[in-house]
Design a protein with these regions (language model features):
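Mixed-charge, Lys/Arg-enriched low-complexity segments
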Residues: 4-7, 52-91
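Short aromatic-glycine-(Arg/Gly/Cys) micro-motifs in beta-strand/loop hairpins
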Residues: 31-62
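Negatively charged, low-complexity tracts enriched in Asp/Glu with abundant Ser/Thr
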Residues: 1-33, 56-60
Length: 91
C-alpha cells in the first residue's frame, strides 16, 4: 500500500499525475508524454510494485518491470525518459 508521504513526493512539475491512491498510481511524463501505471502488489507496505508503460494514450499497457518502492519506480521512469530523449533520440 502506498503511503501518503510517498505519494506527496511525486514531482508534479515532472509528471502529470492522473491518479494517485493507496494501491495505484497513473502518471504521464511531461518530457516524453509516455504513460506509466504503478500497481502496489505489496500489502500492507509498498515492497512489491509492478510497473506498466505505454507510449500513447490509445496504446495498451505492457509490463515494464518491478520495483521495491515508489521512489525506486520513479527513479526508473526518469532514467527511462533520459534514455528515450538522449540515447534513442526518438522523441
Amino acid at each position: 500500500m502506498f503511503e501518503q508521504k510517498s505519494l506527496d513526493r511525486i514531482d508534479g512539475d515532472y509528471f502529470n499525475i492522473i491518479i494517485a491512491d493507496s494501491q495505484d498510481v497513473t502518471i504521464q511524463s511531461r518530457n516524453t508524454g509516455h504513460y506509466w501505471y504503478l500497481h502496489c502488489a505489496g500489502y500492507p507496505t509498498e515492497e512489491a510494485l509492478v510497473i506498466f508503460h505505454k507510449h500513447r494514450f490509445k496504446d495498451w499497457y505492457h509490463q515494464h518491470g518491478h520495483a521495491r518502492s515508489l521512489r525506486q519506480a520513479i527513479k526508473s521512469i526518469v532514467k527511462q525518459d533520459d534514455y528515450q530523449l538522449n540515447v534513442r533520440k526518438c522523441i
